[in-house]
């Protein structure tokens, strides 16, 4: 199984606890939710979460997604998965709390 992952700030996740699906702000601004493969997580954290104390890492089973998953090249040419719609929470297999170095 090739799991995919989404990094989210705890406050953003908490605001959506009582709904069946998750929407990141990027869905409105870019049309999709950014995801990563396991080997990309550390780079994503280093590039996008500088100065952040804690994040949650959602482990997602792509076979359980109810919205379209597309793998696309970033500006660097590296391939990243994106979800073009909301993330159904039934596809989330686990949530890891990760403390980061400030």
Regions found by a protein language model. Name each.
Residues 1-102:
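Conserved, structured core segments of small domains
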């Amino acid at each position: 199984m090739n799991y995919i992952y989404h990094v989210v700030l705890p406050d953003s996740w908490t605001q959506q606890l009582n709904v069946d699906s998750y929407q990141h702000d990027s869905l409105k601004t870019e049309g999709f939710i950014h995801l990563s493969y396991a080997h990309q997580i550390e780079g994503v954290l280093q590039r996008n979460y500088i100065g952040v104390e804690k994040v949650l890492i959602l482990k997602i089973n792509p076979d359980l997604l109810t919205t379209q998953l597309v793998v696309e090249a970033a500006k660097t040419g590296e391939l990243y998965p994106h979800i073009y719609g909301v993330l159904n929470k039934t596809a989330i297999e686990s949530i890891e709390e990760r403390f980061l170095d400030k």
